[in-house]
């Protein structure tokens, strides 16, 4: 083996590691951009909202105006939660957090421990909307997120 062989091998290994790091970084950035910049919709879409350790995942959604969203809420916690979305008035009505069960109202659903529930909501106009759990101390603990409704592109 010549003296150049170990040097060449080190150079090849270094380049392979560099390419791997670049591909991983670019892929991560593209995945992040997809989640933050591309709106769901228009039309009808289904979004799964997971509840883990009294947190909503994802915490932020971008949705095109006019989109009807079917929220599948999956509660991985051993306690009750709720999923409420809508304008600030909806959240003011629920701020006391005394309702453990909700009637069939679009954008409002109660979720049993380790259970699943479905609600739908149509986002008619652009703006920022909140989703939250208003059961006692859940909101303060961090159980809320944001939905940004963006205008649909016109051709």
Feature roles, as predicted:
Residues 13-26:
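Hydrophobic membrane-insertion alpha-helices, especially the h-region
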Residues 23-30, 34, 55, 106-155:
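Extracellular/periplasmic metallocenter environments
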Residues 59-84, 117-125, 129, 149-151:
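Beta-strand cores of secreted/periplasmic/IMS beta-sandwich domains, seen most often
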Residues 81, 94, 138:
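Histidine-centered active-site/metal-ligand motif
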Residues 89-99, 155:
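Short aromatic-acidic-glycine turn motif
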């Amino acid at each position: 083996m010549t003296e150049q062989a170990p040097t060449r091998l080190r150079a090849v290994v270094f380049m392979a590691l560099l390419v791997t790091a670049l591909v991983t970084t670019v892929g991560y950035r593209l995945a992040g951009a997809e989640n933050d910049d591309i709106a769901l919709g228009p039309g009808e879409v289904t979004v799964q909202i997971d509840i883990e350790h009294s947190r909503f995942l994802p915490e932020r959604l971008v949705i095109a105006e006019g989109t009807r969203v079917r929220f599948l809420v999956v509660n991985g916690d051993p306690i009750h939660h709720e999923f409420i979305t809508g304008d600030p008035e909806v959240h003011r009505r629920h701020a006391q957090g005394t309702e453990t069960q909700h009637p069939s109202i679009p954008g409002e659903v109660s979720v049993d421990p380790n259970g699943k529930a479905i609600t739908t909501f149509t986002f008619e106009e652009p703006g920022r909307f909140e989703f939250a759990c208003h059961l006692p101390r859940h909101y303060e603990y961090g159980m809320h997120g944001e939905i940004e409704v963006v205008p649909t592109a016109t051709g």
